[in-house]
Structures are given as C-alpha cells and as structure tokens.
Amino acid sequence: KSLELIKTDKKKFCLIHGKEINHPVGSSINRRIKKILSETEKIIANSEYTKNLAINKGIDKDKVKVINPGVHTVEKLDHKSLGRVESLLKIKSPRLITVSRFDKRKNHEKIIMALRNLKQLYPNIVYICIGHGEEEDNLKKLVQELDLSSQVMFFKDISNNLKNALIAKSNIFVMPSIIHKTSVEGFGISYVEAAQYGVPSLGGKDGGASDAIEHGKTGIICDGNNLDEIYSSLKLMIENKKYIELGKNAKKFVSKFQWFEIIKE
C-alpha cells in the first residue's frame, strides 16, 4: 500500500519477506502486487525461497535479488541470567528451545507431540518455549493432555539477557515451520541468532530455512508436516550428542550474516 502512495521519479527499492506476496496467481491482490513491484528498480528478497516464490507469482525475475537479513554481534551473556537459567533447568537435558510467536506456522504443536515419545528415551528432556500469541492456550492445553508439564516450560515478556542465556544453554533450536494458509517462513532469523551461540537448528523445508541452515552440517531441514520425520530428526541430533558438532559448525557458518558482511551486498 505504501508503495502505491509514493509518487516520485526517484528509484524505488522494495524488500519482500514471503507471506505478503503469497497469494493466488490471478487474484486481485496478486495483480495489484505485480503492478506495484513492476514500478520498482529492484526487489530485495530475504531468501532464495522468497525469490522463487516471487517469480512463481509472476514477478519479474530480473528485478529480484537475494540479500539475507543480518544480525548484530552477539550480546555478551549476563552472569546473573546464566545463573538463573542453571537454577531453572538444573539437570534437565537435552534442552530444546523455540523463540517465536505462538502461531500455527511456527509448528510448536508437532514438537510437543514428538516430545511425548522422546521423553521415553530421554526422561530429563525439556522444551523451552519463549514467546506469546494466539496459539498459547492451545499449546498449554496440549501439554496437559499429553502429560508433559514437567517437560515443557513457557516464558514470555522476559528480558533479552534471560532470553539469550536460555538460548545459549540449550542444545537444539527447534522451529520446523510449515505453510499455514498464506503465511510462510520467508527466512528465519531466529536460526541465525541461535547459531551465534553455537546452537544448531531443526528447520522446516517449507520456507527459507535452508538459507540459514546447512542441512546435515549446521542442523537439519525436515518436513514440518511429518511428525515421524520431526521425531527422527531430533533423535538423530540428540544421539551421541551430535548437536555439539552441528553447533560448532553453525557458529562458524553464521558469521556471514553479520551486518558488516551483509551490507557489502
């Protein structure tokens, strides 16, 4: 909408993230988006996935360039927050974590369902959920129904220091995103933020996670709609503490997402 209102002879550049262009080809909103974007000099997509999505929706491929989002240098961990995390988690291990809104696309539900079987192998496993959103009550209800109250911890409205400490002290960042209606994970900056602390990720194939995760090297890309695949992927990452090797690789890999590197593009 804002691009439509910009009346100028100056060059216009537009950033696209995924879900805002994910509408049926030929629909009124699709035609409107194509018209607006045709008037821009360049379209910056946040991932290869978003670029391909744009092209499939009829947007001029010659105008689209991929520049991934960047991150700032990782914040130094606060000793007080680290101490609080150790007190909260105690002997709980392995530790899974998601930092995101609680909505269908983020797929917390499937992780919780996989946890039911994982706890048979790893009785001290814990899943840390940080965020808020419309699915919060449903997720808490599911946790109760599956008798996982001891395995799932919910946090919201917490400080950045505590959030970062929880990430740093976790073993695997989990967000096997799916497409929900028109909502799609265009990139997934959370994977990069976790990797800065040496935490590998489980991401979903439906979206731009593959730009942020090297499958089999810095994490695993799976089918977020397939519960068995989520379970087996997590089991693989946990067995023999494979997440340690993946985490080391992830920390090296994401150095290219530092803003001082991204800005060169």
Locations of regions flagged by a protein language model:
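Conserved donor-binding/catalytic core segment of Leloir-type glycosyltransferases
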Residues: 44, 88-106, 112-115
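Carbohydrate-associated surface elements
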Residues: 49, 70
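A short helix/loop element that forms part of the nucleotide-sugar donor recognition site in Leloir-type
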Residues: 76-90
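A short, well-ordered alpha-helix in the C-terminal region of glycosyltransferases
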Residues: 94, 124, 151, 229, ...
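Nucleotide-activated donor-binding/catalytic signature segment of Leloir-type glycosyltransferases, i.e.
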Residues: 140-158, 172
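Acidic donor-binding loop of glycosyltransferase active sites
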Residues: 168-183, 199
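Short hydrophobic beta-strand element within catalytic cores of glycosyltransferases
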Residues: 191, 196, 200-203, 213
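Conserved acidic donor-binding segment of nucleotide-sugar-dependent glycosyltransferases
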Residues: 214-216, 220-227, 236-241
